[in-house]
């Protein structure tokens, strides 16, 4: 699939690049996408939730009052779960939420996501561009020129660039990532995929396509 390369003003540069069929034209595997997104979302849990049981709360070392004669219910300890300040019954404990997925399936999921984007004409390739200085206005301007100022957009860069990142971090509908670090969730959670020309090569290498 050949696509035209646009400049930051939204005009055609006269160049075209090939979106390789092995990445952008496969039959998407929905189950692989499901497994990868489930793994990504699950692994975001810290799993540090914890409450104290009756053996961990403070106090309650002795019987709070005598067994008979007070008119109250029998109490052996103020740590009892039915008492205010007592321990919790079956409360949450630290838990590892990690859901594993093998590299082959993760790669298939990313390629499936990219193929969906290509199929729906949601990929734009632009020339390599970085603002001359940290300036949000410049990034807003080129997004507007490309017709992306109102669309949730993922911009893929060939490598980490602080000037571009800091210029775009205040734009609510724009995410900026290095091409080799974009996950299946990142690709599908944005309406448009804006790829810089050099980033396309980085993306292909990260997927094992030279």
From Swiss-Prot:
Keyword terms, alphabetized: Ribonucleoprotein, Ribosomal protein, RNA-binding, rRNA-binding
Any one GO cellular component localisation term in the record: ribosome
Location of region: Disordered: 44-79
A molecular-function term among this protein's GO annotations: rRNA binding
UniProt key word S-adenosyl-L-methionine: no
One example of a Gene Ontology biological process annotation: translation
Pfam families for the chain: Ribosomal_L4 (PF00573)
Subunit structure: Part of the 50S ribosomal subunit.
Primary role: One of the primary rRNA binding proteins, this protein initially binds near the 5'-end of the 23S rRNA. It is important during the early stages of 50S assembly. It makes multiple contacts with different domains of the 23S rRNA in the assembled 50S subunit and ribosome. Forms part of the polypeptide exit tunnel.
Protein family (similarity comment): Belongs to the universal ribosomal protein uL4 family.
Protein name per UniProt: Large ribosomal subunit protein uL4
Source species: Chloroherpeton thalassium (strain ATCC 35110 / GB-78)
